Amino acid sequence: MTISNPRPLLGCIADDFTGATDLANMLVRGGMRTVQSIGIPSAEVAAGLDADAVVIALKSRTTAASEAVAESLAALQWLRDQGCEQIFFKYCSTFDSTAAGNIGQVSEALLEALGSDFTLACPAFPENGRTIFRGHLFVQDQLLSESGMQHHPLTPMTDANLVRVLQSQTRLPVGLLRYDSIAQGVEAVRSRIAELRGQGVALAIADALSDADLYTLGAACADLPLLTGGSGLALGLPENFRRAGKLRDLDAASLPKVAGGEVVLAGSASLATNAQVDAWLEAERPAWRIDPLALAAGEAVVEQALAFAREQQGTVLIYATSTPEEVKAVQRQLGAERAGALVENALGEIARGLRDSGVRRFVVAGGETSGAVVKALDVRLLQIGAQIDPGVPATVSSGGEPLALALKSGNFGGRDFFSKALGQLAGGQA
């Protein structure tokens, strides 16, 4: 029997750009043809949609809670209008949020809009070292609050107890779905969820130590209208639709090849991106560093970077990546918000200038940076391809002249990610 999906099965709302790509990557790996929209799609996009899953990328992680809720509800309405059967709210595997939210408030609003009384919250991503045990989030062997995330310039995470963190962001009761229930399998999880619901719990942090735990959670939650978490929680969702006879049998990861120049743009200050920049510099490949203080002083940094790129024979790295200490020093002078905006805007302008000079393949490091770059390039829709590193797929833009992009969350990717991503975007091996 041939399965024809006139409408998407799974609708996803992500609170940042690279998080959306991370989730889309997971769904493609599971066999779902997936597209990612930058913001809520237009009517024109909706008319031509051919996907099993749609991921809407918002920029709602660090905005005011009221704004994040309004944007998320608008995205939910669009997804429901397309006929999506289940909704997934995606946030970072390190539970990135400000003291004011926004994970709890958005989850609460989505639950209410869907008329549901319960959902899970599980940011675990074991493949990338993010695990949850007794409600506490670990990054590799470190508690979240000791992992380096406590120094994040926008969303410092100083508490690893996710039940406590989430409860501070919502009026709804928060509980814990512990590892011992999950280890007993799908029916035990369903039974424990029923108990939690009976106790009035509306949001439950779910432990997860392995991918097997995530598959168990996915299967147990097949009938929940809403799921929330990191991309790892989506591991088991494609199989739910396949088991129900709703998923098409096709190569979900196929992408067209894109010819043209290439560049690496890095704005993240994370440990992983710092290591990736160091690897590039150690290989003595051409690189240009953006100085936020020079930007603030009105110097022609964008023009200088573009001139540098034009003069080089090989692929260049243009980066604002710095150590946490350097970032804090700049923020003391400029303020965190202004410093971030200056760098994002500059990298966006540089990306646009490079595109105009023939660059067609972009490797971008950092969630905020990726958002600025896709906006500057006027990318509205991405086809999602094969994985480069855990959480990071190759993508190609739809509409207009195609661009190949690898949009990486700051903390993702191995030390050799830049060269590996360039190789995959070019259609070969790094």
From Swiss-Prot:
The keyword Transferase applies. Transmembrane segments: none annotated. ATP binds at residues 268, 366-369, 410. Keywords: ATP-binding, Carbohydrate metabolism, Kinase, Nucleotide-binding, Transferase. Its EC number is 2.7.1.217. It catalyses: 3-dehydro-L-erythronate + ATP = 3-dehydro-4-O-phospho-L-erythronate + ADP + H(+); 3-dehydro-D-erythronate + ATP = 3-dehydro-4-O-phospho-D-erythronate + ADP + H(+). InterPro entries: 4-carb_acid_sugar_kinase_N, 4-carb_acid_sugar_kinase_N_sf, NBD_C, NBD_C_sf, OtnK. One of its GO terms (molecular function) is kinase activity. The keyword Kinase applies. It holds the Pfam family SBD_N. It is an enzyme of class 2 (transferase). Catalyzes the ATP-dependent phosphorylation of 3-oxo-tetronate to 3-oxo-tetronate 4-phosphate. Belongs to the four-carbon acid sugar kinase family. This is 3-oxo-tetronate kinase. It comes from Pseudomonas fluorescens (strain ATCC BAA-477 / NRRL B-23932 / Pf-5). The gene is otnK.
